[in-house]
């Protein structure tokens, strides 16, 4: 074979150009240099004639999806509230993690959280202290009367009687009203009046029928208030703490629920938490004032043969005054007793 001619096997040998584009873009001519194949058609010596085939370009419908996939959409615009939340999240991530506290996982009691009123009432307060002092003074005044110390007994009765107004005023002024105080206040009055009346009856300074009306009515009122309060607990003694609501106990909560159920069933307030305060009546307050005035009149009459009464009323009329106080006291005693009985039947004895 002549040197200027090529071998026949080389005349039509195809040569394929390899593109340097990535494989994903290699088939798209719009993005890469043209690719194609060539044929050796001849040549002499070192000269080779190459006939290049036309380049193959990808169709348009195949190129558009790739262009869309390469397009990066702009970041969405956040509103002011979203930006604020994002800033808060960044600040929280920067804060150091607090140590785990097991007490934070404790769930509060349902009865304590749902109750609108405090589960326990204050007991050790100034109004209750005044009531306790009046209660203790009753036996002391009675003892002085039996011993014949009318002057000291009269002064102590005046101070104790004034304390009946003082403890109520302090409770309202200080906001220290309580279930325990609503029972302690009238109980102290009854103990004071009962002890003085019993001592005067022993000395013969007070008629028996007046003492019977006064003391009998007070005993019935005190006993009745406790009975109706106990009915609110389903006739079961819950303990003194739950009865007077002085501490927060499960028994008190159970008694309150029982009292509410019994109150609804009986059509009245049975003494549960919602109606636990003993309701004082105006006629009962007037009766207490008349009783104290009557006892004071007996003490003045018994002081040195009636010298105290003559000192109070120099012009006379002391006996007539005492007789009028006896009638007024007896009338208001009976009226207040009937009023309390009616309220108890109607379920309105407690508030």
Swiss-Prot record:
Q: What is its EC number?
A: 2.7.8.41
What this chain does, per the entry, is described as: Catalyzes the synthesis of cardiolipin (CL) (diphosphatidylglycerol) by specifically transferring a phosphatidyl group from CDP-diacylglycerol to phosphatidylglycerol (PG). CL is a key phospholipid in mitochondrial membranes and plays important roles in maintaining the functional integrity and dynamics of mitochondria under both optimal and stress conditions. Cannot catalyze the phosphatidyl group transfer from one PG molecule to another to form CL.
Question: What's its catalytic activity?
Answer: a CDP-1,2-diacyl-sn-glycerol + a 1,2-diacyl-sn-glycero-3-phospho-(1'-sn-glycerol) = a cardiolipin + CMP + H(+)
Can you name the source organism? Chlamydomonas reinhardtii
Q: Which UniProt keywords apply?
A: Lipid biosynthesis, Lipid metabolism, Membrane, Mitochondrion, Mitochondrion inner membrane, Phospholipid biosynthesis, Phospholipid metabolism, Transferase, Transit peptide, Transmembrane, Transmembrane helix
- Which residues lie within the region annotated Disordered? 74-120
GO terms for molecular function, please? cardiolipin synthase (CMP-forming)
Protein name as catalogued: Cardiolipin synthase (CMP-forming)
Regions crossing the membrane: 139-159, 191-211, 251-271, 280-300, 321-341
Family to which this protein belongs: Belongs to the CDP-alcohol phosphatidyltransferase class-I family.
Stored InterPro entries: CDP-alcohol_PTase-I, CDP-OH_P_trans, CDP-OH_PTrfase_TM_dom, CDP_ALCOHOL_P_TRANSF_CS
Q: What is its main location?
A: mitochondrion
Protein origin, superkingdom: Eukaryota
The record's Gene Ontology biological-process terms are: cardiolipin biosynthetic process
Q: Does the keyword Mitochondrion feature in the UniProt annotation?
A: yes
Compartmental location: Mitochondrion inner membrane
Name a single GO cellular component.
mitochondrial inner membrane
Q: Which cofactor does it need?
A: Mn(2+)
Task: Identify its membrane topology class.
Answer: Multi-pass membrane protein
- Organism ancestry: Eukaryota, Viridiplantae, Chlorophyta, core chlorophytes, Chlorophyceae
Q: Where is the composition biased (Low complexity)?
A: 76-120
């Amino acid at each position: 074979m002549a040197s200027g001619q090529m071998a026949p096997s080389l005349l039509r040998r195809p040569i394929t150009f390899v593109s340097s584009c990535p494989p994903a873009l290699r088939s798209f001519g719009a993005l890469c240099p043209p690719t194609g194949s060539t044929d050796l058609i001849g040549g002499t010596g070192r000269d080779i004639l190459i006939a290049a085939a036309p380049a193959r370009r990808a169709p348009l419908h195949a190129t558009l999806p790739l262009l869309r996939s390469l397009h990066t959409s702009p970041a969405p615009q956040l509103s002011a509230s979203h930006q604020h939340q994002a800033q808060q999240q960044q600040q929280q991530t920067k804060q150091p993690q607090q140590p785990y506290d097991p007490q934070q996982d404790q769930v509060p009691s349902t009865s304590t959280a749902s109750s609108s009123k405090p589960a326990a009432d204050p007991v050790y307060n100034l109004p209750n202290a005044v009531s306790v002092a009046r209660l203790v003074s009753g036996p002391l005044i009675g003892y002085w009367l039996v011993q014949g110390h009318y002057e000291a007994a009269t002064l102590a009765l005046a101070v104790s009687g004034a304390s009946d107004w003082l403890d109520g005023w302090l409770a309202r002024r200080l906001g220290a009203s309580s279930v325990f105080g609503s029972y302690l206040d009238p109980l102290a009055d009854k103990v004071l009046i009962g002890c003085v009346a019993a001592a005067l009856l022993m000395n013969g300074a007070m008629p028996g029928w007046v003492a019977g009306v006064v003391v009998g009515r007070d005993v019935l009122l005190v006993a009745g208030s406790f009975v109706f309060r106990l009915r609110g607990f389903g006739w079961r003694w819950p303990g003194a703490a739950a009865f007077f609501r002085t501490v927060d106990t499960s028994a008190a909560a159970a008694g309150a629920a029982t009292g509410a159920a019994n109150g609804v069933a009986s059509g009245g307030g049975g003494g549960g938490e919602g109606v636990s305060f003993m309701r004082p009546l105006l006629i009962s307050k007037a009766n207490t004032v008349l009783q104290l005035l009557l006892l004071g009149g007996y003490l003045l009459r018994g002081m040195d043969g009636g010298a105290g009464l003559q000192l109070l009323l120099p012009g006379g009329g002391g006996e007539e005054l005492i007789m009028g106080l006896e009638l007024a006291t007896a009338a208001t005693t009976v009226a207040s007793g009937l009023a309390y009985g009616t309220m108890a039947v109607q379920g309105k004895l407690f508030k």
